[in-house]
């Protein structure tokens, strides 16, 4: 597969992942699947918008750039004949780095939240974080420390785990495009062989 085709494949994969990340973050605003009375009772990490910004919005732009690479002709891109395929591939590398950073942001936020656990109503009738250093992950009996919202522990754990996996996959895909983009910049796209009056990659 040539560098342009590879980039298009990566872009097509990133789009649904961005959607899942965006959706997972939205659902976190409804702990246990219910509307909460006070936004202060939501876990702090939810407000960092890891899935909405990191795995969502910041991932759409690289994905669209990757998808458009295969449509760029070998002699130019975006209507500019002086802009060749190599420059387009180099640009995709920059967007891939942006995507990697966005996915990394979502990944880190998710990992921190999973380790910290959700904010909930505790036995002393105050809202806080009853878990420490991920202790609840290996002991489901500790989940009873959270009285409200109902089922907030499995809810947050599931959604942040989804964000963690999505962010990890996105980081890998963006890293692949960095390498792919550099190869396309240095070596050209194999589909450009013989075009524009040339005999080799452009």
Swiss-Prot record:
Residue spans crossing the bilayer: 10-30, 46-66, 94-114, 159-179
Post-translational modification note: N-glycosylated. Glycosylation is required for the growth inhibitory effect.
Any Pfam family hit: L6_membrane
Glycosylation sites: 124, 156
Keywords: Glycoprotein, Membrane, Transmembrane, Transmembrane helix
Stretches of the chain found on the membrane's Cytoplasmic side: 1-9, 67-93, 180-202
Entry GO terms, CC: membrane
Ranges of the Extracellular topological domain: 31-45, 115-158
Organism domain of life: Eukaryota
GO BP, one annotated term: tissue regeneration
Keyword Iron: no
Subcellular location: Membrane
InterPro entries (alphabetical): L6_membrane (IPR008661)
Protein family (similarity comment): Belongs to the L6 tetraspanin family.
Protein purpose: Regulates the adhesive and proliferative status of intestinal epithelial cells. Can mediate density-dependent cell proliferation.
UniProt cross-references to PANTHER family, sorted A to Z: TRANSMEMBRANE 4 L6 FAMILY MEMBER 1-RELATED, TRANSMEMBRANE 4 L6 FAMILY MEMBER 4
Protein name: Transmembrane 4 L6 family member 4
Species annotation: Homo sapiens (Human)
Gene field: TM4SF4
């Amino acid at each position: 597969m040539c560098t342009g085709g590879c980039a298009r494949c990566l872009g097509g994969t990133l789009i649904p992942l961005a959607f899942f990340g965006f959706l997972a973050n939205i659902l976190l605003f409804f702990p246990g699947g219910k509307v909460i009375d006070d936004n202060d009772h939501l876990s702090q990490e939810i407000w960092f918008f890891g899935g909405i910004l990191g795995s969502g919005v910041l991932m759409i732009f690289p994905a669209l750039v990757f998808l458009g690479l295969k449509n760029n002709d070998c002699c130019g891109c975006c209507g500019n004949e002086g802009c060749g395929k190599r420059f387009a591939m180099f640009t995709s590398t920059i967007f891939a780095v942006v995507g990697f950073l966005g996915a990394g942001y979502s990944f880190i936020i998710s990992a921190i939240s999973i380790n910290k656990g959700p904010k909930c109503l505790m036995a002393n009738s105050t809202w806080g974080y009853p878990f420490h250093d991920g202790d609840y992950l290996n002991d489901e009996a500790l989940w009873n420390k959270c009285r409200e919202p109902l089922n907030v522990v499995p809810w947050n754990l599931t959604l942040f785990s989804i964000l963690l996996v999505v962010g990890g996959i996105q980081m890998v895909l963006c890293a692949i495009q960095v390498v792919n983009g550099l190869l396309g910049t240095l070596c050209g796209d194999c589909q450009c062989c013989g075009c524009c009056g040339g005999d080799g990659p452009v």
